[in-house]
């Protein structure tokens, strides 16, 4: 694996990420959510993609793609491992979202190219990274209250907002993916909350991928 070449690709791609608001439709009619995971000891990569109406946040479509994993796990290069499955799920959607939430990092990455940014560039869609763990940068400790907020900083640059979305839950790291500003990324996530730790787009993507009760009930209603 030529990590020097991959690192150079990341730096080049990161220079093309748009950190300003460039939504084609604002407000969006549809917001998507995406989640990626691995099965069979990492040999299979799956990606779940959901489509929600906005502002109702009603689930209207979902797709799950499973493909052979194309590269091993290497810290800092996860987007190269994840985007092929995301692309396979994306291509199956009959209606593409106007804005996509990705479970993972956006520019809050050592080379400013997490999976939300990488995939946003690939398909040229506005994306937001909604990550559960810090990858780089520093932030001031948050209070335990829901709504506590702190900027994630690295070398004098704000990479994300660290936001405690729910009491007694770890915070989320909300960042520009592509064509969405840092402040707007936070605002969109906040608009898509319904009392859970995760915003509805990525919560539904996780529910679809994991076969959670909420998704099972939704399937029963559709029959």
UniProtKB/Swiss-Prot annotation:
Reaction equation(s) it catalyzes: Endonucleolytic cleavage at apurinic or apyrimidinic sites to products with a 5'-phosphate
Top class in the EC scheme: hydrolase
GO process terms (BP): DNA repair
Cited InterPro entries: Endonuclease-V (IPR007581)
Swiss-Prot/TrEMBL site (Interaction with target DNA) positions: 73
Location within or outside the cell: Cytoplasm
GO cellular component: cytoplasm
Enzyme Commission code: 3.1.21.7
Cofactor(s) recorded in Swiss-Prot or TrEMBL: Mg(2+)
Keywords, in A-Z order: Cytoplasm, DNA damage, DNA repair, Endonuclease, Hydrolase, Magnesium, Metal-binding, Nuclease
GO molecular function, one term: magnesium ion binding
Binding annotation for Mg(2+): 35, 103
PANTHER family the UniProt entry points to: ENDONUCLEASE V (PTHR28511:SF1)
Family, similarity comment: Belongs to the endonuclease V family.
Protein role: DNA repair enzyme involved in the repair of deaminated bases. Selectively cleaves double-stranded DNA at the second phosphodiester bond 3' to a deoxyinosine leaving behind the intact lesion on the nicked DNA.
Entry-linked HAMAP family: Endonuclease_5
Name assigned to this protein: Endonuclease V
Species whose genome carries this gene: Salmonella paratyphi A (strain AKU_12601)
């Amino acid at each position: 694996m030529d990590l020097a070449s991959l690192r150079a690709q990341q730096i080049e791609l990161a220079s093309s990420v748009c950190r300003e608001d460039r939504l084609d439709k604002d407000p969006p009619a549809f917001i998507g959510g995406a989640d990626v995971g691995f099965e069979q000891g990492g040999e299979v990569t799956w990606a779940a993609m959901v489509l929600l109406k906005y502002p109702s946040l009603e689930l209207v479509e979902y797709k799950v793609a499973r493909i052979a994993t194309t590269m091993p796990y290497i810290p800092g290069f996860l987007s190269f491992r994840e985007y092929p499955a995301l692309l396979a799920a994306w291509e199956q959607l009959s209606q593409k979202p106007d804005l996509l939430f990705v479970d993972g990092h956006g520019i809050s990455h050592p080379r400013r190219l997490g999976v939300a940014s990488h995939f946003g560039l690939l398909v040229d869609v506005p994306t937001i990274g909604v990550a559960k763990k810090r990858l780089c940068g520093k932030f001031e400790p948050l209070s335990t209250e829901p709504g506590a907020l702190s900027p994630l900083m690295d070398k004098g640059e704000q990479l994300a907002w660290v936001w405690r979305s729910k009491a007694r839950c770890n915070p989320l790291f909300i960042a520009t993916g592509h064509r969405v500003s840092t402040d707007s990324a936070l605002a969109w996530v906040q608009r898509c909350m319904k009392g859970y730790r995760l915003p509805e787009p990525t919560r539904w993507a996780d529910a679809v991928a994991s076969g959670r009760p909420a998704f099972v009930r939704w399937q029963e209603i559709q029959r």
